[in-house]
């Protein structure tokens, strides 16, 4: 069961998800930030789930937010919908059109480059390929460190004083990053190489909207061992 107050217009809110998914985590954090009460339904097999096939017949993927009888799909799309639908809590996206465009750009970058780089390390085979995948992920972290310094302007989050769109997009990847750090021995978020991200991650983990829904790292470790049959996870 989710948190907080009744939803807008007393319409029922339901979230279909799976606990290891960083994309599902995004939607849960956004709902918590906006103090939205919702029912969370764990979907163990999305490919055969009747609910998933019914509400997302095209991609057959989670997360799916159901507001009343309306399904909203894709994690970033859901986060934007939550921000625009519920005015309670801090805004997730900036009000300035340019700043909104910047935030959306970086979340797309996180999905297209950082998340794919995380998966690239996880599935890499052979020392040369593993090292190349690690180097690519380190480049992503270096660029996000620069982005944090620019967007935060000396404050605690990418979004300024509060968690924003980029925080949610990247923060949802912290669990998988930590799992990779455990198995590779590489610190992708390091106090010397990425000091801004290092301290940001502590603040993100501790946030009241985040802490209750972050997956347990040891459970993620076991999940990764089962999902990825590569030498990294042996």
UniProtKB/Swiss-Prot annotation:
GO terms for molecular function: glutathione transferase activity. Its EC number is 2.5.1.18. It comes from the Eukaryota. Residues 11-90 form the GST N-terminal domain. Its main location: cytoplasm. Belongs to the GST superfamily. Tau family. This is Glutathione S-transferase U11. It comes from Arabidopsis thaliana (Mouse-ear cress). The gene is GSTU11.
